[in-house]
């Protein structure tokens, strides 16, 4: 099903595209993301909360859409976390102007045993809304696909399911790398 239709920006607008969803705004772009959020809620069953954003190729707006839907959920009062799982070409730090790129999920994926404290140490506030947290990709690893295939990804997601209403995953293009196929195993719904 089509959950929303987000306009394609020209190249100059793409480079400055960021967070466009804001509290108490009723413009067209806010309404598009509210509509996407509502349609995603209809697609999810009661215990489902993990939404993966991907595309066929780079530059199609995965990060932009994932981030703005995450903000939209947070503005609804839902505890939301946005995970940077495009660990080859991370972009969330730039979008949210978070400079600490040493924190992130790759620090967890390399571990055998992960505690809640380990996970919480990698989470950062979004700076946009108190209901929205972010876990960046972290240091870029030499073996992204192998790292994402580990059981540690499921452990992280399962732990986050206990703490958050929605978990939004910003991933690599499914048409270019196999990383996203591995992530799909822990996902409840995929938006392309």
Put a short name on every predicted segment:
Residues 19, 25-192:
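P-loop NTP-binding module
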Residues 1-17, 138:
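Beta-strand-loop-alpha "switch" segments that mediate conformational coupling across diverse proteins
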């Amino acid at each position: 099903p089509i959950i929303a239709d987000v306009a394609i920006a020209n190249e100059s607008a793409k480079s400055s595209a960021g967070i466009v969803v804001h509290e108490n705004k009723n413009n067209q772009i806010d309404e598009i993301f509210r509509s996407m959020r509502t349609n995603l809620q209809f697609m999810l069953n009661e215990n489902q909360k993990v939404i993966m954003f991907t595309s066929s190729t780079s530059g199609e707006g995965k990060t932009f859409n994932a981030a703005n839907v995450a903000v939209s959920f947070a503005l609804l009062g839902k505890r939301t976390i946005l995970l940077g799982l495009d660990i080859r070409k991370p972009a969330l730090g730039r979008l949210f102007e978070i400079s600490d790129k040493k924190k992130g999920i790759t620090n967890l994926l390399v571990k055998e045993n992960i505690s809640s404290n380990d996970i919480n140490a990698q989470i950062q506030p979004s700076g946009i809304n108190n209901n929205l947290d972010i876990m960046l990709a972290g240091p870029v690893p030499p073996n992204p696909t192998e790292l994402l295939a580990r059981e540690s990804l499921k452990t992280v997601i399962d732990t986050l399911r206990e703490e958050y209403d929605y978990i939004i995953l910003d991933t690599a293009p499914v048409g270019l790398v196999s990383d996203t196929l591995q992530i799909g195993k822990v996902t409840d719904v995929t938006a392309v």
